[in-house]
Amino acid sequence: MFRISQYLHALEPSVGNTPVRPAAPLAGMQGPVVIWNLVRRCNLTCKHCYATSADKDFPGELSTRQVMETMDELYRFGTRVLILSGGEPLMRPDIFELSHYAKQKGFYVGLSSNGTLITEQNIHAIKEVGYDYVGISIDGTRQTHDTFRRKLGAYDESIRGIRLCHQAGIKVGLRFTLTQDNQYELPELLALMEREAVDKFYLSHLNYAGRGNKNRASDLHHQMTRRAMDLLFETCWSDVKAGRKREYVTGNNDADGVYLLYWAQKNIPRHVEALQQKLVRWGGNSSGRNISNIDNLGNVHPDTMWWDYTLGNVLQRPFSDIWMDTSDPLMKGLKQKHRPLQGRCNLCQHRNICGGNSRTRAWQLTGNAWAEDPGCYLSDVEIGVADLPERIPVTAYAGRIKKAVV
């Protein structure tokens, strides 16, 4: 996750005297952030769902006791942040029991929901948990969102969920996955954020996992991505200068950090040196390092986009043992300070900022986890290379390919 607001507020800390919350809860934490898909069942079948969720039971999911025992082990390991996800987490009958347990242990707890099941009947229970943050997905205006989510009326139900959270005093965020189908609706989504007094805007670039991989042909061309990021940076900077507390973050494309640096050179050049130092300290992609995933069956993955690569299972080995085991070739590479990147990513002058970006896009398109990330939208001039072979094209999904960590 790339916290745009955090970096821009740090450049103008005196403006408005309203800095956004810093990136703690990570401060001083030993274990990774755990995004936990507690249930795979969902009342929607979204086109870009990495979990390929559906409205049916998935056998073998962890029991209440098994989840709590794993939470205990995670806390001992040093993890302090849990993002409870699905499927739709509100479809798990014990979601509030598990959430209360996590809060009582001292975890920062976020809830990742599609928002359609947040109602007058359960908003009190949601408030009683004391979630630190509730993220609700909105992928466009009404018709576009309902098409993405494959359910008529999903947009109105999600907006209701946002309003109920806001009325209950719960910090709520809007999550938006950017594709060719909804790119022109980004201005309207940013306006929606203001109208509904949403606290946080999360823009996710399309990553190639689950249905997102099967629909990867809808990913943006690079110039489209650049236009979207220009708008997001400009909107965030306007909020910073006005002293507004809204947060803007992105995910699944760590080239955003480098592009912000180039945006700053054009728009706020006096801050470029300080910004570059902060971005290098950030270091980019955290898969296998500070971000992890446990799926509904207890399988551990380097992050949520690696469901076809399992490191181990919490019912068979402690999470801490799985996470620290670098005998696995993928984890060995991800944990290295200088990842074994190849091609364009290896030659990039900014790899110390982006960390090699998303490895899953390279994995799904080429079968090689260390190949160039086709989602990088920076030009050859910007990354400091010349006379490279043609970029890896984003081809339509045509079935599984042979993969290897080399």
Show where each model-derived region lies.
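N-terminal pre-core extensions flanking Radical SAM catalytic domains
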Residues: 1-56, 72-75, 319, 393, ...
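C-terminal accessory region of radical SAM enzymes
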Residues: 223-274, 299-355
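Short Fe-S-cluster ligation motifs
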Residues: 73-86, 371-406
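Radical SAM/AdoMet-radical enzyme domain recognition
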Residues: 64-221, 225
